[in-house]
Amino acid sequence: EELGALGVRTATLSIEPDFGIAIDVTHATDYPTCSPQKSGEIKVGAGIVIAKGPNIEPNLGRRMLDLAKQNDIKYQIEPIARPTGTDANFMQVTGRGVKTALLSIPCRYMHTPNEIVSLVDVNEGVKLLTYLCDVELDNK
């Protein structure tokens, strides 16, 4: 999405998928000058982040949460009350529209020369995506 979402728009129009899962980073808020009361509480090393909000198809979001719980996958929830600014937003509104979900890796100091992520979070995301690919999703 950093370059105008050209790739996701082209892919969505060409493939016309039933579902789309955007994978991105999100701001970790576990550093000294950040207020969790103002910015929410997202921690590096505490698991993959599952977004909830208007860009997220509710059934797909619930399925991801259920799979994380059933398989002991570490996760965090990030409420997003507006369009996400990620590929999930562009998939949702391109062409006929696509049911979307968003998984994010917590990133401390995003958009600086010293970004920090945890392989724990990356691996939890890989596990969740693997389980998601193994289940039948209802396309109603």
Task: Please provide the spans of the model-predicted regions.
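Active-site-adjacent substrate-binding region
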Residues: 42-122, 126, 132-137
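Acidic/histidine-rich catalytic neighborhood of metal-dependent amide-processing enzymes
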Residues: 1-47, 137-140
